[in-house]
Amino acid sequence: MTEIEEIKRQVVKQALELEPGGFRPTNSLTESWIGRVYLYKENERIPLDKNGEQMIPLLQLCIDNLPLIPKALSKTKVITVFIASELPFEITPNGKEWILREYTESDELVIKDLKNPSSLLKAFPLKPKIIKEDYPVFDGGGLANELEERILELEESGVIDDYGELLDNVYGHKLGGYPSFCQP
C-alpha cells in the first residue's frame, strides 16, 4: 500500500448525499424535503420566532428509510428544521432564531399542509445517494495535524501536485461524511 493509499484509508468516510429535485414527490411519511416540512405531531404547528412571526420551514429529514444511517441517529425517525426570516449574527441556542425538532419511533406524526407564505424558499424533495468515499477539505477540519503536515511534504516533494487531487470532498446536502462549508 502506498503512502497516499494509507492516508486515504485513514480518513475516508461514507456519507449520504441528498440530491434535490429531479423526480416526482410522493408526499409520504418517509420523504425528505428541503424548503418544506409537512410532518408534525398533532398539536404542533410552524413555530414562531422572537417577533411572533412564523419561521421558515427549511428541512424535513426522514431517517428511517435512508440507505445509510449514522449511529448517532439510529433511534431518530424524523428531523425537522425551521429558521427565522431574520437570521442571527451570532450562534443562538435551539429555539431562539431556529428550531430543530427530533422525532423517534414512538412519536406519532401526521401530515399537515402548513406553509409560511412569506418564505422565499422553493421546496424540493430530496433523493438519497450513497457516497462511498468522502474526505475532509484540507483546511476545514477532519485531518490530524500530522496528516496535514505529511500531505504538505508530499506536495513540496512533487509526489502530488495538490491535496485536491489526493482526497475529494463531496459538496452539497449530505448526512455523515465531512463538512463542506466551514467557517471558523
Predicted features along the sequence, with ranges:
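Preference for intrinsically disordered or flexible, low-complexity segments
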Residues: 1-184
